[in-house]
From Swiss-Prot:
Coiled coil: none annotated. Pfam families: PA, Peptidase_M28. Induction: Down-regulated during erythrocyte differentiation. Expression unchanged by cellular iron status. Its main location: membrane. One of its GO terms (cellular component) is cytoplasmic vesicle. It is a single-pass type II membrane protein. Keywords: Cell membrane, Cytoplasm, Disulfide bond, Glycoprotein, Membrane, Receptor, Signal-anchor, Transmembrane, Transmembrane helix. It is found in: Cell membrane. This is Transferrin receptor protein 2. The lineage of its organism: Eukaryota, Metazoa, Chordata, Craniata, Vertebrata. A motif (Endocytosis signal) lies at residues 23-26. Residues 103-798 are extracellular. The chain crosses the membrane at residues 82-102. It comes from the Eukaryota.
Length: 798
């Protein structure tokens, strides 16, 4: 009893102190000594904290300054319920706080990441928690700015035409660098593709000819190495016509002005659309050939910045597609048998790049009406008339060569979901120095490999595998990337989570653009808020945009272009993708796809800010990889596609009256969109109410989320006939864009004009429209059904 009194007195004396609990077993002489200490400490306490003196039932405690008799037994009985209640409250509060903290740790990396040393059994050891701020600091600590600039400079000095002997040397050098990093796998993948090159024995030529076809004057093509890969070969003769950018609307305007396009040679400017699109549109309007030149008005006029030389032509392929056009839909592996077909995107008319100097000579010969003011460029000696001009003959002698190209792969395996890949890639080859075209991307890619390897060595444990790829054949239309996708499509659509492209990432230091799938928009917004602007001190990239534009995404977000490797991942393989780019505020980077795309010109163009801009891109890509590779729940906004569908439905509503007159309706499309939105909302609620530490459940949700993009690939067309099956981004009769183009034929004036290749020369065909509408609707409905999960959760009232 004496021991219990002493302990109770000790609790009473310590009650005003901070809440620190230490348990120590005392008995015998130690307890007597402890009581003596207690009496001494109690004497020093102020009156209001005077402890009870407990000596037995016949004694009462007293305290100087006040007299409150407290019988010891009554005090014990009164204190016991309070002690029990306080204990329960503390236990309950601790349990709730621990539960909330644990759930939070399982969410996005904005909270925390649990990292376990790979050499220790996780069940036998404690866990080391790395928070998002820790991961950011670790990433920035290992990311090296100086190394990237050196790599850009050195890479741009090396010849790296796809399939060349010097490219093989570069491949080996990169493999040697990767072998020095802590990586799980490093390998190469070789494809044998058909690439087109100039014939050194028979150069391409351009001549003025008379009515009989006799040559009057030869126009020298200053650099015989500049050409358009995949151009049709042979002769093309016709009257010259100036056609602005060569868009469909430009050629429509020419027809409206009475300019004859059939049988002509078109002179068009670089920009707005790709070379392949310009040639495809010209072919649809009956032109015989296309000449493409860079007009000075399309590039920066800043006298303090370098400009493109007037004698320099711009390189560009003219295959309206990606990959090897001689094996469409099939991978170009060695010894593989292919059907005797070619891509429908190959042009049937020749095309050739020319310089501004040659274009000036051609424009001076044109007669006919003066071009609209907005069509006029900055060639000082030209009046910019529309034509026609004298007869011109173009001869193209390019030839096809079977060429081996090699992609390089490096992998860090995931620790929880190694069969799910976060992929990042950059083009390695270039026609010319290619500083901005591919040296920047290659430098960032290699630095990210080194950085993440160092992070893993220092405790970072990504849940999913990181796959770093250096592509070959990019200048010929993302050949290396597309052939790899074709070869492993059956695997990749189940395993690839996201693709991040580093191509063309630094073309200036003004505007920032993200060409991306809608699934990544919310994640990009989050990352932009955490990366500093390279040219606005004290601001993040998000603040740089948001302070000057009310809608940040309208300024930053753009659709994926066909000439990007990211396009193949999304439109062909159904993998969400993104490509970042810093651009000039007023004009495009003038040296892209020319021999003047050197490190020196890029450095001058950015006024010495190249290291800062490259660092910003690396931070964007790196933080994106961290989020995608280790968040328990994939940060993909699957609800965004509901807004995309609604936006497209707005275009269809314009024709609802015309359709009603024919007994047709768009109700099925509206219903499918509603089912998709409901499925997305239901999945979101399921995730919100689920246990985040349930690994099996989280994996099930992640599988459904990562396949959303794949759901929008039409299952009703053949990948061999229509490789780009995506109903929003793809090419073909199955797309929503083709459906809208077909609807426009309802109001066509009978002139035979068309707004796209798909509808050129055709009127509205009700049976074709019904088929288009049905296939589109069922693709959208299939996406809604797949997002719903199990078959018993699907709304079958469609």
């Amino acid at each position: 009893m004496e021991q219990r009194w002493g302990l109770l007195r000790r609790v009473q004396q310590w009650s005003p102190r901070p809440s620190q609990t230490i348990y120590r077993r005392v008995e015998g002489p130690q307890l007597e000594h402890l009581e003596e200490e207690d009496r001494e400490e109690g004497a020093e306490l102020p009156a209001q904290f005077c402890p009870m003196e407990l000596k037995g039932p016949e004694h009462l405690g007293s305290c100087p300054g006040r007299s409150i008799p407290i019988p010891w037994a009554a005090a014990g009985r009164k204190a016991a319920p309070y002690l029990v209640l306080i204990t329960l409250l503390i236990f309950t509060g601790a349990f709730l706080l621990g539960y909330v903290a644990f759930r939070g740790s399982c969410q996005a990396c904005g909270d925390s990441v649990l990292v376990v040393d790979e050499d220790v059994n996780p069940e036998d050891s404690g866990r080391t928690t790395l928070y998002w701020s820790d991961l950011q600091a670790m990433f920035l600590r290992f990311l090296g700015e100086g190394r990237m600039e050196d790599t850009i400079r050195l890479t741009s000095l090396r010849e790296r035409v796809a399939g060349s002997a010097r490219m093989a040397t570069l491949v080996q050098d990169i493999l040697d660098k990767l072998s020095r990093q802590k990586l799980d796998h490093v390998w190469t993948d070789t494809h044998y593709v058909g690439l087109q090159f100039p014939d050194p024995a028979h150069a391409n030529t351009l001549h003025w000819v008379d009515a009989d076809g006799s040559v009057q004057e030869q126009l020298p093509l200053e650099d015989p190495e500049v050409y358009c890969p995949y151009s049709a070969t042979g002769n093309a003769t016709g009257k010259l016509v100036y056609a602005h950018y060569g868009r469909s609307e430009d050629l429509q305007d020419l027809k409206a002005k009475g300019v004859e396009l059939a049988g002509s040679l078109l002179l068009v400017r670089v920009g707005i659309t790709s070379f392949a699109q310009k040639v495809a549109v010209a072919q649809d309007f009956g032109a015989q050939g296309v000449l493409i030149y860079p007009d000075p008005s399309d590039f920066s006029q800043d006298p303090h910045k370098p400009g493109l030389s007037s004698h320099q032509a711009v390189y560009g392929h003219v295959h309206l597609g990606t990959g090897d056009p001689y094996t469409p839909g099939f991978p170009s592996f060695n010894q593989t048998q292919f059907p005797p077909v070619e891509s429908s995107g190959l042009p049937s008319i020749p095309a050739q790049p020319i310089s501004a100097d040659i274009a000036d000579q051609l424009l001076r010969k044109l007669t006919g009406p003066v071009a609209p003011q907005e069509w006029k460029g900055h060639l000082s000696g030209s009046p910019y008339r529309l034509g026609p001009g004298p007869d011109l003959r173009l001869v193209v002698n390019n030839h096809r060569v079977s060429t081996p190209i090699s992609n390089i792969f490096a992998c860090i395996e995931g620790f929880a979901e190694p069969d799910h890949y976060v992929v990042i890639g950059a083009q390695r080859d270039a026609w010319g120095p290619g500083a901005a075209k591919s040296a920047v991307g290659t430098a960032i890619l290699l630095e990210l490999v080194r950085t993440f390897s160092s992070m893993v060595s220092n405790g970072f444990r990504p849940r999913r595998s990181l796959l770093f790829i250096s592509w070959d054949g990019g200048d010929f239309g993302s050949v290396g990337a597309t052939e790899w996708l074709e070869g492993y499509l059956s695997v990749l659509h189940l395993k690839a989570v996201v693709y991040v492209s580093l191509d063309n990432s630094v073309l200036g230091d003004g505007k920032f653009h993200a060409k991306t799938s809608p699934l990544l928009v919310s994640l990009i917004e989050n990352i932009l808020k955490q990366v500093d602007s390279p040219n606005h001190s004290g601001q993040t990239l998000y603040e740089q945009v948001a302070l000057t534009h009310p809608s940040w995404d309208a300024e930053v977000i753009q659709p994926l272009p066909m000439d990007s490797s990211a396009y193949s991942f999304t439109a062909f393989a159904g993998v969400p993708a993104v490509e970042f780019s810093f651009m000039e505020d007023d004009r495009v980077y003038p040296f892209l796809h020319t021999k003047e795309d050197t490190y020196e010109n890029l450095h001058k163009m950015l006024r010495g800010r190249l290291p800062a801009v490259v660092q910003a891109v690396a931070q964007l890509a790196g933080q994106l990889l961290i989020r995608l590779s280790h968040d328990h729940l994939l940060p993909l906004d699957f609800g965004r596609y509901g807004d995309v569908v609604l936006r497209h439905i707005g275009n269809l509503n314009e024709f609802s009256g015309d359709l009603k007159e024919r007994g047709l309706t768009l109700q099925w499309v509206y219903s499918a969109r509603g089912d998709y939105i409901r499925a997305a909302e239901k999945l979101r609620k399921e995730i919100y109410s689920s246990e985040r530490n349930d690994e099996r459940l989280m994996r099930m949700y992640n599988v459904r989320i990562m396949r959303v993009e794949f759901y929008f690939l039409s299952q009703y067309v053949s990948p061999a006939d229509s490789p780009f099956r995506h109903i929003f981004l793809g090419q073909g009769d199955h797309t929503l864009g083709a459906l809208v183009d077909h609807l426009r034929m309802l109001r066509a004036d009978g002139s035979g004009a068309a707004s796209s290749r798909l509808t050129a020369g055709l009127g509205f065909q009700e049976s074709r429209f019904r088929r288009q509408l049905a296939l589109l609707t069922w693709t959208l409905q299939g996406a809604a059904n797949a997002l719903s999960g199990d078959v018993w959760n699907i709304d079958n009232n469609f």
